[in-house]
Amino acid sequence: MIRSLRAGVALAAVLSLTAPGFALAIGLPHLPSLPKIGHSSAPAAFQMLPPGVWPQAQSDVPADPDVRFGALPNGMRYAIKRQAVPAGQAAIRLRFDAGSLMESDAQQGLAHFLEHMAFNGSKNVPEGEMVKILERHGLAFGADTNASTNFDETVYKLDLPKTDDDTVDTSLKLMRETASELTIGKEAVDRERGVVLSEERASDSPAYRVFKQRLGFLLPGQRMPQRLPIGHVDVLQKAPPSLIADFYHHYYRPERATLVVVGDFDPAAMEAKIRAKFADWRAVGPAGPEPDLGRVEPRKTEAKLLVEPAAALSLQVTWVRPPDLAQDRLAKRRSDIVEQLAFAVLNRRFSALARSAQPPFLGAVAFKADQGHSAEVTMLNLVAQPDGWRTALAAVDQEERRAVRYGVRQDELDREIAEVRASSQAAVAGAATRRPAQIADEIVGSLGDQEVVTAPAEDLAIFESAVKGLKADTVSAALKAAFSGQGPLVFMSSPKPVQGAEPAILAEYASTQKVAVAPPTAPHQVAWPYESFGTPGKVAETKEITDLDTVFVRFDNGVRLTVKPTKFRDDEVLVRVNIGDGLQDLPKDRQSLAWFGNAFIEGGLKQIDNEDTERVLASKVYGARFAVGEDAFVLSGSTRTADLPTEMQVLTAYVSDPGWRSEAFKRQQSAGRTLHDQMEGTDGGVIQRELSGLLHAGDRRFTFPSRDDIAKAQLADLQAQVEPHLANDPIEVVIVGDITVDKAIDAVSRTFGALPARRAAQPVPASQRLVSFPAANAQPLMLTHKGRADQAIGYVAWPTNDLWANPQQALDNDVLGEVMDLRLIDELREAQGVTYSPSVSYSHSLTWTGWGYLAASVEVPPAKLDGFFRDVSKIANDLRTKDVTADELERAKKPRIDKLEKSRVTNQYWLAELSGAQADPRRLDFIRHIIPGTERVTAADVKRAAQLFLKDDKAYKLAVEPQGRKAAD
């Protein structure tokens, strides 16, 4: 369902080196990425719909006719939609109008705690059994079985790999248990405290602390800043089960519940199952009160500075108004679209500034957003270098005032309309093959704002009615009206103190507002210059791989094309271009500049820059990404069927005529200057930075760039490493999706097939394919972070082997990893309650000779690290010496097999698996073998794999602790 336009067209590309990314850097983890837009209104309480009523009953917006909406006599609503593609899959969501805003002072954090208790015992399902029951039906914990708590809702999620009666009935039974039958026993609550506290530790990042402070600054005295979903540590540590049970009975009630089921089933039969399972549900005790969210108070221009050493420099200028509580109506949606187009134009201007030769900031966006029905805000957001905030603030303020004073131009508006129309048309074309989880999440996402669930075709129709005859003056007026309200309020987070603090920020803002702004200049005319690459190439050879519905093609210039037509997603076509040998072509002893890959795309093409490319191709759906893979330099993109020729033109132009503009490289380099400071702020950031280099024994192709590497990097070095391979190495094109073989051949023949012949593929020297694994250590390698004193990570890895050494052994190792994951969860999360997210990962390389691993990791307080290493060693020993049970084997294998089967009906799976298959037919054999090979793994195979690889004297251990812990101890 279309709700808003993209904010900041190239922002992700500009800021790819920021950590943890722009949204988190400005402290917006809880704001929607595509904010809902509306008009301000007088303060009022958010009115819930009467029990059992859907929004369309009070709206003129047509509801999706393919969704069966209903309600039970007890007030519980349900929405059912048949989605037959992919076959045999379904998604179930149970949403409660119950979040942290409903908590009392003594219950802060208990809405989320209750979500955890849903997996810890009910009247008919013993503690610890719910997840195991689902695993036996192929649902993996975390991936297919999950839940989330927000300010105003709690949602339970099941993604079903099968829709047989047993799986569906079991899933509905467990949802019913969650709704009304939880036991919330004392022992279970006490065990779960450590898990919830672990989640609190893990979530307390620099970006989250920025978010908390900013929310409190924007909404002082209101309930939302006082009811963050994670809650208060003292409540989590001490709250009795009775307080959790009180919240449960007050807010988990039929009239506050909505069940959404989407998938491959008969809707009438599903409706009967829902009625049979939920009709007798009755609420217990009195209903809980609706929270008083508070009022937006009158305020003048104010500023607040937060010094957060591990955060990026971010600044927001915000106007705050009472929330928009108007009903969802066609007129409102049309006005929202007009307003969103206005913001899209402004954000496009910010993008152009960020791409300029002397960019005043790293990135900036503007939007309006609802804040939990507590307020509506208009925000100007920017990220800049710490010493450049004044220049950045001036640029954002002046560009906003320029847009408000002089308005938007018709050509700017028409461009945004064309882009939204193209993406909306693609959404309509692909509607029949959306995934059940996507549709279910969209329906759930509409409930909090009481919006009508609409079909993509209706969204497009509303959009077209809104933009028909739309003039720039109307959009300009909407933009001007959006910048109103209390304030503006200026919030800055900085990694270091700012001289003069808040008074200096206010003075700078006042100063820039005195600067007169001139009208914007109209852009120059431009045309797409890469429609022809010469005489189309001729097909030299064609080979059909009939059992995989795949065709191999070789052109006379040596370019290879692999095509797999599918109907997994209507109107979706994925393209990947593999050139040369990637990391294998780079030196082992010098820092690779592959991490500057975004600068390659942002650098544009010789005949047209990236900004103009986006403008001239606004009506097309295309993509361009660049990466240095282990076995190829990779260009990739996604498109719709009609735009495949354009997609191929774009990718061919990047290979044959890249622009290598220095501005893009410098922006990337500038963003990287504070990257180490940001990553050192959490244990997760440190391990993210260090792990790849450590697991490859210091091979510079895999190490993260040092501060010095970033500072001294030169565009010429990147160009020297990459350009010769792009210009001369063999090319393989893989196309998967809603396309015919003939159309794929035609598009490639006119682009890559028309290029001059490339040199023949050469074997990679054995020394370049050899990567070492780190030597075992008796004591963990200790790394430090600068975050909270109670945050630490433990990590253990054992070397295994590459895939081709023994493909069946690799699958045995995968199942071994799944069994170890089950045992880590049982021991560290369920039995000890010391961590939220123990995990096991494994890899068997298709590229590096002899390289593979199986690893276990955990986030715990530092004092628990030794216990983790002991527990992992014991689990490894048990796996070496004792047989796994039949139940464990089933719970390990079935979710993995079901995951593989689900993956095989996606275009992404085949794009990855078919890459390189023409040069290495073993990849085809492994595609055929992976599911039957996993099915045949036995308990004896798992034990043998553990004996081969889980040896104490081979284990490589790593720990990330808070800086200064040993000195403090």
Q: Where do the language-model regions lie?
A:
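C-terminal segment of classical bacterial N-terminal signal peptides
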Residues: 15-24
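Bacterial N-terminal signal peptides that target proteins for export
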Residues: 1-10
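Non-catalytic, conformational "gating/processing" segments within enzyme and secreted inhibitor domains
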Residues: 181, 186, 193-194, 244-275, ...
